[in-house]
């Protein structure tokens, strides 16, 4: 079955589209990517998305027009990736504007902006969208949803395997081995903390918007990370919350960056970017250490996806800090890093079409099996 997946992440840099053909057992399918397309948001839209997500007040008219524009851009990406409309289903995540983590006395919340019925009619195809609401209504965090699909897409090894996504936010999937006493264990997943969100903001600020991200980690590699400050940052109570755990740009965004910059004082932009990038690697390393302390789980391999996998300095830091773990980009096993999340939502859309529910208890914390997404016919 052909499915088109559309994804725009917390980095808000654009839309990734993937056309994929699924066959076989939905729990461990064979899949083949037929085409991909990436659309970069105009800077005006990206800025508005980030600003609205961090509290900018806009009128109802502006809300509607932003939703329409994002929907129309997703339609453009879909048509470009699948010009003959061969997909039986289109799965579209929409653009996250706000995420609220679950608190003891308050349910979580997550807002993705997309007009699903409009997209279905623009494309004249079945659309699956609004993937997080059912999870949140069932007591879950609504994130990280990629962890629900990773085992089906990448499979198991003879030891514990991890999949790390480095988008705006970093999240981890922990996949049990296929043999031995742990083979009946559950897949685990959680949001770790900031990945590219802080670095991208800092790069833009420190270069007067001439750069929007640290390509290949070139700025970070020229600086010296402030390790004693990083050790202090790692004591943030968020990093000690046991999974399920979720977060977003609301927690690790502009205000958080300003606070951390004040603590760092007057340092060069290279040292700032190096410190923030090393901080991300240290968060992952600390999470893996805590995983062993709490559950005696030690990874043999960590597959890295997302924009951060192209950051050579960050990849070196991960290998350095995650001792004994083979760290490598996910594209080495045939999963294209840039399109992994679009592939995930294509898979969830396929499962929705088939009526396949998933129990996310050990990933999002939801209390029952869920059919992810809402179907809209044209």
Curated annotation (Swiss-Prot):
ATP binds at residues 9-16. Its EC number is 2.7.1.170. It comes from Prochlorococcus marinus (strain NATL2A). The keyword Disulfide bond does not apply. The lineage of its organism: Bacteria, Bacillati, Cyanobacteriota, Cyanophyceae, Synechococcales. Keywords: ATP-binding, Carbohydrate metabolism, Kinase, Nucleotide-binding, Transferase. GO terms for molecular function: ATP binding; kinase activity; phosphotransferase activity, alcohol group as acceptor. This is Anhydro-N-acetylmuramic acid kinase. Catalyzes the specific phosphorylation of 1,6-anhydro-N-acetylmuramic acid (anhMurNAc) with the simultaneous cleavage of the 1,6-anhydro ring, generating MurNAc-6-P. Is required for the utilization of anhMurNAc either imported from the medium or derived from its own cell wall murein, and thus plays a role in cell wall recycling. The keyword Oxidoreductase does not apply. NCBIfam families: PRK09585.2-5. It holds the Pfam family AnmK. Pathway: Amino-sugar metabolism; 1,6-anhydro-N-acetylmuramate degradation; Cell wall biogenesis; peptidoglycan recycling. It comes from the Bacteria. Disulfide bonds: none annotated. GO terms for biological process: 1,6-anhydro-N-acetyl-beta-muramic acid catabolic process; amino sugar metabolic process; peptidoglycan turnover. It catalyses: 1,6-anhydro-N-acetyl-beta-muramate + ATP + H2O = N-acetyl-D-muramate 6-phosphate + ADP + H(+). Belongs to the anhydro-N-acetylmuramic acid kinase family. It is an enzyme of class 2 (transferase).
